[in-house]
Curated annotation (Swiss-Prot):
Residue sites binding 1-deoxy-D-xylulose 5-phosphate per the record: 131, 156-157, 181, 204, 217, 222-223, 226
The keyword Phosphoprotein is annotated on this UniProt entry: no
Listed cofactors: Mg(2+); Mn(2+)
Role this protein plays: Catalyzes the NADPH-dependent rearrangement and reduction of 1-deoxy-D-xylulose-5-phosphate (DXP) to 2-C-methyl-D-erythritol 4-phosphate (MEP).
First-tier enzyme category under EC: oxidoreductase
Ligand binding (NADPH): 15-18, 41, 130, 132, 210
InterPro entries (UniProt xref): DXP_reductoisomerase, DXP_reductoisomerase_C, DXP_reductoisomerase_N, DXPR_C, DXPR_C_sf, NAD(P)-bd_dom_sf
Lineage, top ranks: Bacteria, Bacillati, Actinomycetota, Actinomycetes, Bifidobacteriales
Enzyme Commission number: 1.1.1.267
Binding site for Mn(2+): 155, 157, 226
Protein name: 1-deoxy-D-xylulose 5-phosphate reductoisomerase
Record pathway: Isoprenoid biosynthesis; isopentenyl diphosphate biosynthesis via DXP pathway; isopentenyl diphosphate from 1-deoxy-D-xylulose 5-phosphate: step 1/6
PANTHER family for the chain: 1-DEOXY-D-XYLULOSE 5-PHOSPHATE REDUCTOISOMERASE (PTHR30525), 1-DEOXY-D-XYLULOSE 5-PHOSPHATE REDUCTOISOMERASE, CHLOROPLASTIC (PTHR30525:SF0)
Amino acid sequence: MSIASNSTVIILGSTGSIGTQGLDVISRHPERFTVTGLAAGGAHIELLAQQAAQFHVSEVAVFDETKVPALQAALAQAGAQGVRVTGGPDSVIAMAGSGANVVLNGITGSIGLEPSIAALKAGSQLALANKESVVAGGHLLFSAQVRENQINPVDSEHSAIWQSLRSGTHAEVAKLVVTASGGPFRGWKRADMENITPEQALHHPTWNMGPVVTINSSTLMNKGLEVIEASRLFNVPPERIDVTVHPQSIVHSMVEFVDGATICQASPPDMRLPIALGLSAPDRMTNVAAACDWTQAATWTFEPLDDEAFPAVQLARHCLAASEKHTAVLNAANEQAVHAFLEHRLPYLGIVDTVKAVLDQMDAELRGNPLFTDVEEMNQLELEARRRADDLINKQ
């Protein structure tokens, strides 16, 4: 779908990494976009109020309902007038489903699924950076579409694949190749990782992201989730999706075609590029991000993934082959384990070990009916996965 020349936009997760960069892109093209609503968790109330004032939005929603009074005060302080303020998860879902031309979903975690579904059902084009929507509830998400091609992927890897797929038909695709920077511990062996601290893991060599995504990038669980997302978004089986380590993070992913040609998308690492395309596709905008400087000598390297040191990708592949419920448990248990690690309650190697243990516990009960019937069923399964992860973490 071609986005209207002056599109209404709602930003979910506006104070996070995706949201702030999305607003930066929009600020450079005021003639193309009008931001009508912002939603955020509630951890950065002053920033949310400043965004509302800068973009003259009509509505702001906050997940944490207790932050509504503080947000109202911050809006007054920022000089934002006539802004409707709502609170609680239902208010964010309602905003997402209000019928904007584009909804940019930069929420972290599976709580982003219901807003994604609401946006699709309302006919909005969904610029999707919330990979958990696809990982935990892909069937529910895709069945909510009211037309074809309603989802614009915003993850840099999936945006790269999306762009590269324009070079051929689906039948001509031999494989997808997802690139990984390797994270801060590239080249480390498993034995070297026992004493990794949150502070070390939060230092990513390439990308500036939120804490959960940064930890996922260090364990390469993020890459595992991206393999799941790529398979479901582009209808390619997992055995035809490779992962290669590319430390320079210039080639963001590739598509290999049946004739031997490989098409890639290359650019210096800057999330504003895939965000901008997610907002404006199929059109491209000027003044978004820097291009590669082809006048300078450069070396791009690619190396195989060390599955022994980073078992998360293989674990994700196993879940993808098993069922949607397995991938939902993978995601929920991982979120719980990452939070425990960030709070110094779980050692670094315990993150993926905990996820695997939860999956082992729940495997038999997940195999009966592989698809969720509704979001409530998914939420209940995730709660059980989180509970089991907590039990294992508390025994550490």
